[in-house]
Amino acid sequence: MSERKAFVSRITNETKIQIAISLNGGHIEIKDSILCKKQQENGSDVAAQTTKSQVIDIQTGVGFLDHMIHALAKHSGWSLIVECIGDLHIDDHHTTEDCGIALGQAFKEALGQVRGVKRFGTGFAPLDEALSRAVVDLSNRPYAVIDLGLKREKIGDLSTEMIPHFLESFAEAARLTIHVDCLRGFNDHHRSESAFKALAVAIRESLAPNGTNDVPSTKGVLM
């Protein structure tokens, strides 16, 4: 299996983003951080975790978004570093959307040709009273159907309307088909987190080896 690593830098007038990813876990780093020393020191430990198998450090400037991306990386088995400086003086839209786009681009680059993997993945994840389901296809046909049933205007400092939009942006850039549904639950934090964890479980299954070196498609290509 290849290293399945990528580094993406995405700079616009609205955001500056750097992402390092390894779909296999293991060591990764960003040598030239775009974050100032104060930002690095004030980074949330809640969204940073280093073990022998994974390195995760998420700093988008939006706490709940950090928390969700951390959960996605952890349960997908990725190592992931995300640095973002966004125009949060306006609102959280550009930061959230652009992080989804950049993460999708990094995922797509790290994955490379879809060959020798299951391609399809299904995941369920509970969090207390909440239960979510996710289905993934490494199809190269970007499509996202997201139904989380969120009712609050915000969770922490993240607008709830941006949570499905992040997933849509990620799927579009990664060229995935994803269906993510929260089946039950009354706490919007739990509903969101269970959805991201279910997606992680589904992605992890879709990337698992299928015992061949074939392209898992009747077309013979997924590109």
From Swiss-Prot:
Catalytic activity, per the record?
Answer: D-erythro-1-(imidazol-4-yl)glycerol 3-phosphate = 3-(imidazol-4-yl)-2-oxopropyl phosphate + H2O
Task: From the Swiss-Prot or TrEMBL record, give the protein name.
Answer: Imidazoleglycerol-phosphate dehydratase
**What pathway, per the record?**
Amino-acid biosynthesis; L-histidine biosynthesis; L-histidine from 5-phospho-alpha-D-ribose 1-diphosphate: step 6/9
**EC number of this enzyme:** 4.2.1.19
Q: Which family does it belong to?
A: Belongs to the imidazoleglycerol-phosphate dehydratase family.
Show the SUPFAM superfamilies listed in the entry.
Answer: Ribosomal protein S5 domain 2-like (SSF54211)
- What does the record give under GO molecular function? imidazoleglycerol-phosphate dehydratase activity
